């Protein structure tokens, strides 16, 4: 329709006869097409009607077949289904009857077994008094289900004229009677010390279902042995023995060893007769006795050693020497009196008498011994009580059982040992640092005169460094030997703080107030004694840093040469619980890092002061003397003989002057410190050489450039003699400057604009600098 409308519109819109004919032609074509399609549809209608008729016939035929099929199903298959249903029901009834028969037979057999056990128990407990057999019958009866034992059938069948009571009553009465009998016999054997009888009756308790009674009796038995031996060890000692340094440590060690021997020796027996994991109940009972006996030892140690009084004395100690040393008004003379001098002895006598360091050291040794033994004991019990298979695969380390973590002994270890040991160790170390500086002595007979021998052996440090680092090593070793994380977490940070604040602080104060190398007169050099003292203090820092690093690495116990990151640290043996070993390792590394940082900062400052006040003022005069009366613009043939004689005059002058300054310092400084100082000195020397070369602008000809290059090279060789070849790197600018001075014009033209290194020379001079250097040579 839309086409017709459009066509009519075209016709109506026609403006000429030709357009009308064209529109009519299109309409005729459309008419022919529509007529053809209609004829095709009319022709296909007959075939469609015929196919629909065939479908109606097929539908009627299928309806007939469906009726026949339903008739066959209801007539034939229903009989088969009914038969199958009857057979299935019969099979099910047969299976049920069979299972009932089996259940009945099983009950009959169990009742027969029950009757045999009841009669066996009654017979064995009679005249024969065969307790093992009676217990065996009770054990067999315990395997019979309770519903059978308590059932009416058993109550009807089992009783006899000799045993008229129901089986449950008979069994319970027999078990109770045997339990009382076994308990009496067990305790009697324990009192008599008859080990075989103790074992005999101990094995019978689980057979009669009295496991807890047996374990409790056994626990009391072994605890009596523990208590008896502990009292003997403690009370048999004479008063003089109790005053010995490690009496209490040895006593509690014997207690722990005895308990460990009992657990190790008796565990197989308990596990075999009572089942896996049952030894833990005996261990818990032993721990109660350990709380008592160990508590007595710790209480007596705390009282006899006057721990509370010692802690009071420690808290009241003023550390007068350290405090006064850091006061701003403190201006000690260069020769500080020794502590043994009459000038200082009177002021400290009362303090030294108030706290006996030897006694504190002894208490710390004994305390560390007890803590270490307790750690081994705790680890042993934790291993014994640990589950055979962890709940998950994540390794949380060893876990302390709850009965031990909440025990009175554990609480007393914390209050009577760990807290006092932490306080006394911190005091002991700080007082040792104070004492070391009170007794500090510099190395004897040091001199800057290279012709005189040194009166000491290197490294040249004061006595305080060796003294303090010896105490650091001792304190760290003793702290780790306790195997207590709480001791490490308190002591190691305290040691780190004292080292950083007071050990380094004392050296810093001496460097600033007593030994600062300041010239006496303007433009002069510092006094020799000040320079020597300053050098020694710088050595103190370097050697102390090396000591601390070695102490920590020794405790970590790892070999850095193997390159294996998964090497297990020995700290895992000392600290097996949780992640304590990782915590301890990180704490030690933090101490090492903190000390290295503080000592390194002060060391670098000291090297800078030494360079600025001692070495730097000498560099310019040394160079001036080396280049004195040397000309680099000689005429051809002028003074050739003289120049050949003085070919190395600059190098020899410099070597002489440089050696006068450097060699005395090198004799005293450690090699690491000397390398640090030399690096600063060479940087300054390189800068001075660059300025010296530039100062010859317009005063260097081609012959002079050759000699200047030789002289600069000679100075570099003399300055870096005996050091690493890499020290020459700071002179790259000077070397390249002399290289440019001696280039031919065409050679220089090739490298003048080189910025990419195509010339084969890694230039440190930029393009403009190269041009300015080239201009130094007279054209």
Predicted region positions:
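Eukaryote-biased recognition of C-terminal alpha-helical segments
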Residues: 399-424, 428, 432, 570, ...
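Acidic, polar low-complexity intrinsically disordered regions
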Residues: 54, 58-88
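Extended alpha-helical rod/solenoid/coiled-coil scaffold segments used as assembly/tethering elements
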Residues: 372, 408-710
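N-terminal alpha-helical scaffolding segments that mark the starts
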Residues: 1-50, 57, 87-89, 100-101, ...
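Extended, noncatalytic alpha-helical scaffold/tether regions
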Residues: 81, 85-88, 92-412, 416-417, ...
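Terminal end segments
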Residues: 657-660, 664, 712, 716, ...
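Extended alpha-helical scaffolds
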Residues: 22, 29, 33-36, 61, ...
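Extended intrinsically disordered, low-complexity coil regions enriched in Ser, Thr, Gly, Ala
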Residues: 133-136, 154, 387-389, 393, ...
């Amino acid at each position: 329709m839309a086409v017709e409308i459009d066509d009519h519109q075209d016709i109506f819109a026609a403006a000429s006869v030709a357009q009308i004919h064209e529109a009519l032609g299109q309409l005729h074509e459309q008419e022919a097409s529509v007529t053809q399609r209609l004829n095709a549809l009319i022709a296909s209608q007959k075939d469609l009607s015929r196919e629909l008729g065939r479908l109606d016939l097929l539908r009627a035929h299928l309806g007939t077949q469906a009726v026949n099929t339903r008739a066959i199903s209801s007539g034939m298959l229903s009989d088969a289904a009914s038969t199958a249903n009857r057979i299935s029901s019969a099979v099910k009834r047969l299976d049920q009857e069979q299972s009932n028969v089996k259940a009945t037979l099983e009950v009959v057999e169990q009742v027969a077994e029950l009757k045999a056990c009841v009669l066996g128990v009654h017979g064995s407990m009679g005249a024969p008094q065969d307790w093992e057999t009676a217990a065996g019958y009770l054990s067999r009866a315990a395997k019979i289900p309770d519903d059978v034992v308590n059932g009416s059938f058993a109550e009807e069948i089992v009783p006899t004229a000799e045993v008229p009571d129901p089986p449950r009553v008979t069994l319970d009465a027999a078990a109770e009677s045997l339990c009382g009998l076994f308990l009496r016999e067990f305790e009697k054997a324990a009192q008599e010390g008859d080990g075989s009888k103790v074992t005999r009756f101990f094995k019978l308790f689980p057979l009669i279902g009295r496991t807890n009674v047996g374990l409790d009796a056994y626990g009391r038995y072994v605890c009596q042995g523990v208590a008896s031996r502990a009292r003997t060890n403690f009370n048999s000692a004479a008063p003089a023995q109790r005053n010995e340094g490690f009496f209490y440590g040895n006593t509690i060690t014997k207690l722990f060893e005895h308990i460990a021997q009992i657990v190790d020796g008796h565990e197989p027996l308990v596990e075999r007769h009572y089942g896996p994991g049952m030894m833990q109940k005996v261990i818990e009972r032993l721990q109660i006795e350990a709380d008592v006996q160990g508590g007595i030892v710790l209480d007596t140690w705390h009282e006899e050693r006057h721990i509370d009084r010692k802690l009071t004395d420690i808290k009241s100690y003023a550390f007068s020497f350290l405090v006064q040393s850091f006061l701003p008004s403190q201006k000690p003379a260069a020769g500080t009196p020794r502590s043994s001098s009459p000038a200082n002895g009177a002021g400290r006598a009362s303090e030294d008498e108030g706290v006996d360091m030897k006694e504190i050291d002894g208490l710390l040794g004994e305390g560390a011994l007890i803590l270490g033994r307790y750690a081994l004991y705790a680890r042993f019990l934790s291993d014994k009580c640990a589950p055979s298979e962890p709940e998950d695969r994540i390794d949380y380390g060893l876990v302390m059982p709850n009965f031990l973590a909440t025990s009175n002994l554990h609480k007393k270890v914390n209050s009577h040992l760990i807290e006092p040991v932490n306080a006394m160790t911190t005091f002991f170390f700080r007082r040792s640092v104070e004492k070391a500086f009170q007794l500090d002595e510099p190395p004897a007979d040091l001199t800057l005169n290279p012709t005189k021998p040194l009166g000491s052996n290197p490294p040249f440090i004061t006595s305080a460094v060796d003294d303090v680092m010896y105490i650091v090593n001792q304190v760290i070793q003793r702290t780790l030997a306790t195997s207590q994380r709480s001791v490490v977490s308190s002591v190691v940070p305290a040691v780190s703080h004292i080292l950083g604040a007071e050990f380094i602080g004392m050296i810093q104060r001496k460097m600033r107030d007593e030994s600062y190398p300041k010239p006496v007169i303007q433009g002069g050099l510092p006094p020799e004694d000040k320079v020597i003292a300053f050098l020694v203090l710088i050595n103190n820092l370097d050697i102390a840093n090396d000591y601390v690093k070695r102490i920590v690495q020794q405790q970590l116990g790892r070999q850095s040469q193997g390159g294996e990151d998964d090497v297990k640290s020995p700290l895992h043996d000392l600290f097996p619980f949780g992640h304590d070993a990782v915590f301890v390792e990180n704490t030690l590394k933090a101490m090492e890092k903190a000390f290295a940082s503080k000592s390194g900062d002060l060391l670098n400052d000291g090297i800078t002061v030494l360079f600025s006040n001692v070495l730097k003022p000498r560099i310019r005069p040394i160079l001036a003397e080396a280049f004195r009366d040397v000309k680099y613009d000689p005429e051809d043939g002028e003074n050739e003989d003289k120049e050949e004689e003085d070919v190395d005059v600059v190098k020899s002058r410099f070597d002489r002057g440089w050696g006068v300054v450097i060699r005395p310092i090198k004799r005293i400084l450690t090699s690491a410190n000397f390398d640090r100082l030399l690096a600063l000195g060479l940087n300054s020397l390189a800068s001075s050489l660059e300025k010296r070369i530039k100062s010859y602008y317009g005063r260097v000809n081609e012959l002079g450039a050759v000699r200047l290059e030789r002289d600069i090279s000679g100075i570099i060789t003399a300055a870096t003699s005996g050091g690493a070849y890499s020290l020459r790197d700071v002179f790259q600018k000077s070397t390249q400057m002399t290289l440019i001075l001696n280039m031919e014009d065409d050679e220089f033209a090739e490298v003048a604009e080189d910025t990419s290194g195509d010339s084969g020379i890694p230039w440190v001079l930029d393009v403009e600098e190269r041009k300015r250097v080239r201009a130094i040579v007279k054209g």
